[in-house]
Amino acid sequence: MNNINKIFITFLCIELIIGGGGRLLEPLGIFPLRYLLFVFSFILLIFNLVTFNFSITQKCVSLFIWLLLFPFYGFFVGLLAGNKINDILFDVQPYLFMLSLIYLFTLRYTLKVFSCEIFIKIVNAFALYGSLLYISYIILLNFGLLNFNLIYEHLSLTSEFFFRPDGAFFSKSFYFFGVGAIISFVDKKYLKCLIIVLAILLTESRGVLLFTTLSLLLASFKLHKLYLNTIIIILGSVLFIIMLYMVGSRSEDSDSVRFNDLYFYYKNVDLATFLFGRGFGSFILDRLRIEIVPLEILQKTGVIGVFISLVPMLLIFLKGYFLNSTKTSLMMSLILFFSITVSITNPFLFTPMGIFIIGVVVLWVFSIENIQISNNLTSGAK
């Protein structure tokens, strides 16, 4: 069973990291692999339970229950508000992937360690080789050595890619460039980190660049002295200014959409909405989903929902960043920090990609790390 679990975990990581939003195979008419993996995780869970090939920690169970409170709350507020059931279910859909965390959280200790290690390895490989490939694409495109129309014709068949007018593009899997940059920086592989950050710059995604840089700065505060932190602040500021210059007036459309969303909430909020929200299935202007995730949470679940969703994230981050002492805990906490903050401008955290990251971080910070510390204390006592 262990080998079967390892193969499944490896394939799951590859699909989530490289597959991004899960729509790469959309043009082929193939049933989404993500749904099949979701179902298969429950089949494996049953086999693990039947064969006693599982391990449960109280903290993982407590955090899992707390994580589920948020979609349950949004669902019931939506029902009480009289929102259409189809719209409510549309909002619930991304959170269903949280149920797959039951599989992760009940794995045996060795498989939990394997899950975290294989996740880091696959992100490392994808971030580096994906960045090199993307940088090569931009160079060849600017030298006129690529047929952009042909590339656009093929890649635009799926909704996974978002093209810029100058030929640059962003894929949802590119969020893992930011994760890879954090891993490389904490591992002190600075050249690799710079290559990945350069690729992020060339995607022209301001939010990903900004919050990757902030995550690297937080890592530097723990790892380096003041002069290196200053260098990172200056370098990050320069890169962001370059990004703003590259994007230019093209950012006005997306900025105006975000501003209109904020203005709509401001004009329509009342005390009940502010406290309890309007529930899942409620709209901001004519959309169920918006780019500013915190605003969407506030609109649909109020400050109560913000509190419910934020508390477990803060607990995980604070424990990994301040209380645990290992390099991997620092890495994991900053990956979570990036996932939370990048969701201010791009929906990421409560997607299958973001939910899986939450699961992996919880595994390390609240399960693996605790057992390792306990074992070290026991060894020391002997």
From Swiss-Prot:
Protein name: O-antigen polymerase
Superkingdom of source: Bacteria
Subcellular location: Cell inner membrane
Gene (UniProt): wzy
Keywords: Cell inner membrane, Cell membrane, Lipopolysaccharide biosynthesis, Membrane, Transferase, Transmembrane, Transmembrane helix
GO cellular component: plasma membrane
Catalytic function, reaction form: n lipid-linked O-antigen repeat units = a lipid-linked O antigen + (n-1) polyisoprenyl diphosphate
Spans traversing the lipid bilayer: 4-22, 35-54, 63-81, 95-112, 126-146, 168-187, 190-206, 209-226, 230-247, 301-318, 330-349, 353-370
Knockout-associated phenotype: Mutants produce a semi-rough LPS, which contains only one O-antigen repeat unit.
Function field: Polymerase involved in the biosynthesis of the lipopolysaccharide (LPS). Catalyzes the polymerization of the O-antigen repeat units on the periplasmic face of the inner membrane, leading to the formation of the lipid-linked O-antigen molecule.
Pathway: Bacterial outer membrane biogenesis; LPS O-antigen biosynthesis
Membrane topology (Cytoplasmic): 1-3, 55-62, 113-125, 188-189, 227-229, 319-329, 371-382
The organism of origin for this protein: Shigella flexneri
Molecular function per GO: transferase activity
Broad EC category: transferase
GO biological process: lipopolysaccharide biosynthetic process
EC number: 2.4.99.27
Principal location class: membrane
Periplasmic topology ranges: 23-34, 82-94, 147-167, 207-208, 248-300, 350-352
Recorded topology in the membrane: Multi-pass membrane protein
